[in-house]
């Protein structure tokens, strides 16, 4: 009887740990071919396809970059992409993965990877626009070389928070702070945009480092193309799910303790700019949503 009881206890503990692990992170992404979810939007000839469309390589030259977007628009969900950044001298280039709506007071959720001179690290800039207002930049260095291997970059967006992930590590959280008078993206469907383009007027050292076109073409690589969201192309009200979708469940309304520790690690080790702590920009009081930032 004692042996059976002990075995039962072990099973319960293991089941609890497994359940906690599942709750801690978004559902496992389903990787599909490019054409399943996406279409090119400009400079079609600057995208090359491999492995039957499972992998693509956007190209940037002195004439143009390129981009792609999904076939539908989405309101809430989990969106991810495996990306390998432009290697070598990538100064002046920007590789972008972001969500955006389509009107003047638009919402937007940005990953922007800012290229640099050979040997210097990439900078990952994130930003959040709500009701047409942005200016919420945060910048970090990555703890790996993003040009060597594919890494997954993902966005979890629900009615409670927006979480930016690098692989399984949360690097930023933007909480719903409507009670503080801060707008939150909740009623404008967004498309997922991806692009490789020249931004040497600002991208590297504030525009001091220009794109060296003798190094062109600049080539990034994408795969994965995961979308698990509520398609709202026809009727956005359909996506007002009131807790019916997996991303609305209680375990996804805040980070768990382990995720907060990982986020704190990123903040302490790799953050190089956070608008919430920019006293030159905000000499008297930081923006109200910064009150929800546990590390400040």
From Swiss-Prot:
Keywords: Apoplast, Cell wall, Cell wall biogenesis/degradation, Disulfide bond, Glycoprotein, Glycosidase, Hydrolase, Secreted, Signal, Transferase. Residues 24-222 form the GH16 domain. It catalyses: breaks a beta-(1->4) bond in the backbone of a xyloglucan and transfers the xyloglucanyl segment on to O-4 of the non-reducing terminal glucose residue of an acceptor, which can be a xyloglucan or an oligosaccharide of xyloglucan. Coiled coil: none annotated. Its EC number is 2.4.1.207. Disulfide bonds join 230-239, 276-290. Transmembrane segments: none annotated. Glycans are attached at residue 116. Xyloglucan binds at residues 112, 125-127, 135-137, 201-202, 206, 281. The record marks 110 as: Important for catalytic activity. CDD domains: GH16_XET (cd02176). InterPro entries: Beta-glucanase/XTH, ConA-like_dom_sf, GH16, GH16_AS, XET_C, XTH. One of its GO terms (biological process) is cell wall biogenesis. GO terms for cellular component: apoplast. Catalyzes xyloglucan endohydrolysis (XEH) and/or endotransglycosylation (XET). Cleaves and religates xyloglucan polymers, an essential constituent of the primary cell wall, and thereby participates in cell wall construction of growing tissues. Belongs to the glycosyl hydrolase 16 family. XTH group 1 subfamily. This is Xyloglucan endotransglucosylase/hydrolase 1. The lineage of its organism: Eukaryota, Viridiplantae, Streptophyta, Embryophyta, Tracheophyta. The gene is XTH1.
């Amino acid at each position: 009887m004692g042996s059976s009881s002990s075995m039962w206890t072990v099973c319960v503990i293991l089941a609890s740990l497994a359940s906690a692990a599942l709750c801690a992170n978004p559902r496992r992404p389903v990787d599909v071919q490019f054409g399943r979810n996406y279409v090119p939007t400009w400079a079609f000839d600057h995208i090359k396809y491999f492995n039957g469309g499972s992998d693509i390589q956007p190209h940037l030259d002195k004439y143009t970059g390129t981009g792609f977007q999904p076939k539908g628009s989405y309101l809430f969900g989990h969106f991810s992409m495996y990306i390998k950044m432009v290697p070598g001298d990538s100064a002046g280039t920007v590789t972008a993965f972001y969500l955006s709506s389509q009107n003047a007071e638009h919402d937007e959720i940005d990953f922007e990877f800012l290229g640099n001179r050979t040997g210097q690290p990439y900078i990952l800039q994130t930003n959040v626009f709500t009701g047409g207002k942005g200016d919420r930049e945060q910048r970090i260095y990555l703890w790996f070389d993003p040009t060597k291997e594919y890494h997954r970059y993902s966005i979890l967006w629900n009615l409670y928070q927006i979480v930016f992930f690098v692989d399984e590590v949360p690097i930023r959280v933007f909480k719903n702070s409507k009670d503080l008078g801060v707008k939150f993206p909740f009623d404008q469907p967004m498309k997922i945009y991806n692009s490789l383009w020249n931004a040497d007027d600002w991208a590297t050292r504030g525009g001091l480092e220009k794109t060296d076109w003798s190094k062109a073409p600049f080539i990034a690589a994408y795969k994965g193309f995961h979308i698990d969201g509520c398609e709202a192309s026809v009727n956005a009200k359909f996506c007002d799910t009131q807790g019916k979708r997996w991303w609305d469940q209680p375990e996804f309304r805040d980070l768990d303790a382990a995720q907060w520790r990982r986020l704190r690690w990123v903040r302490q080790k790799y953050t190089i700019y956070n608008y919430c702590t920019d006293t030159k920009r905000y000499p008297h009081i930081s923006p109200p949503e910064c009150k929800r930032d546990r590390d400040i």
